[in-house]
């Protein structure tokens, strides 16, 4: 398989999995066992490509928040987005400076998929007994920020799954409202992560080793695919639970543990 085709497939995979609660990083780590390992910069860039999709899907909401910033409700929502981002940025930077790196084996990803799937089922069962609430509290905002860090530390957890379900558990029980807040927080989070990694690699003189054609193709593939997925998901969760995704995670994690040799 050519490197360009491999990059295209990884971009499509990122777009498909970044916003579904099934872990994009986990799927990319698994896929790279067969499609070839890529740099951290490549992975961050295609994640940023997927975030472009969020900007396009929620462009009207973003415009509303910007033009209506003088209104208390919009202003508080923006401040809570900022708080969630700052928590992720500060705690994430501490974790990064501590030298934490992603595991190179699939087994931890498999376990994270299984545990995350069970967590999703439990939260769905609990919140089903609660009235629908769409108010983002400060507790929800801080929780979402911390959940994003956890997802970054443990691939297979899923940023969207950990953040959306913690938001639901903390009181933002309406799925669409929780997903919207998490996706909007993802915009500055992933763009900041991309910029940080870019500057680090530039200082180290490592950018010359990247194939920019492959990076560009993967970025566009992730953006286009992500746009379609986000539009579909926001409609789907208005009338469906996340149960199907939870069962998929458990099945995939179990299959990986059964089929992959130990140490993989």
UniProtKB/Swiss-Prot annotation:
Catalytic activity reported: di-trans,octa-cis-undecaprenyl diphosphate + H2O = di-trans,octa-cis-undecaprenyl phosphate + phosphate + H(+)
Membrane topology listed for this record: Multi-pass membrane protein
GO terms of biological process kind: cell wall organization; peptidoglycan biosynthetic process; regulation of cell shape; response to antibiotic
Broadest EC class assigned to this enzyme: hydrolase
Principal subcellular localization: membrane
Keywords: Antibiotic resistance, Cell inner membrane, Cell membrane, Cell shape, Cell wall biogenesis/degradation, Hydrolase, Membrane, Peptidoglycan synthesis, Transmembrane, Transmembrane helix
Transmembrane region(s): 38-58, 75-95, 106-126, 136-156, 181-201, 217-237, 242-262
Cellular component, GO annotation: plasma membrane
Signal peptide: none
EC number(s) given by UniProt: 3.6.1.27
One annotated GO molecular function: undecaprenyl-diphosphatase activity
Subcellular location: Cell inner membrane
Function: Catalyzes the dephosphorylation of undecaprenyl diphosphate (UPP). Confers resistance to bacitracin.
Matching HAMAP family: Undec_diphosphatase (MF_01006)
NCBIfam families hit by this protein: PRK00281.1-4
The family this protein is said to belong to: Belongs to the UppP family.
Note: Bacitracin is thought to be involved in the inhibition of peptidoglycan synthesis by sequestering undecaprenyl diphosphate, thereby reducing the pool of lipid carrier available.
Protein name: Undecaprenyl-diphosphatase
Provenance organism: Stenotrophomonas maltophilia (strain R551-3)
Taxonomic lineage of the native organism: Bacteria, Pseudomonadati, Pseudomonadota, Gammaproteobacteria, Lysobacterales
Gene: uppP
């Amino acid at each position: 398989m050519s490197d360009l085709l491999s990059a295209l497939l990884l971009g499509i995979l990122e777009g498909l999995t970044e916003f579904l609660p099934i872990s994009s990083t986990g799927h990319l780590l698994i896929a790279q066992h067969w499609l070839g390992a890529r740099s951290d910069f490549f992975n961050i860039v295609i994640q940023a490509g997927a975030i472009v999709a969020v900007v396009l899907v929620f462009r009207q909401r973003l415009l509303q928040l910007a033009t209506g910033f003088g209104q208390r409700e919009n202003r508080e929502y923006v401040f809570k987005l900022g708080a969630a981002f700052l928590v992720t940025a500060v705690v994430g930077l501490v974790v990064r400076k501590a030298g934490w790196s992603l595991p190179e084996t699939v087994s931890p990803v498999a376990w994270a998929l299984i545990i995350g799937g069970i967590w999703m089922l439990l939260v769905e069962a609990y919140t089903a007994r609660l009235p629908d609430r769409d108010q983002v509290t400060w507790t929800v905002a801080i929780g979402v920020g911390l959940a994003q860090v956890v997802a970054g530390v443990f691939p297979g957890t899923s940023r969207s799954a950990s953040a959306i379900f913690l938001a639901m558990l903390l009181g933002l029980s309406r799925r669409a409202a929780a997903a919207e807040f998490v996706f909007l927080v993802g915009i500055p989070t992933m763009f900041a992560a991309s910029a940080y990694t870019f500057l680090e690699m530039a200082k180290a003189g490592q950018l010359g080793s990247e194939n920019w054609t492959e990076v560009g193709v993967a970025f566009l593939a992730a953006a286009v695919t992500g746009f379609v997925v986000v539009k579909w998901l926001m409609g789907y969760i208005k009338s469906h639970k996340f149960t199907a995704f939870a069962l998929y995670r458990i099945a995939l994690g179990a299959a990986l543990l059964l089929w992959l040799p130990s140490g993989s």
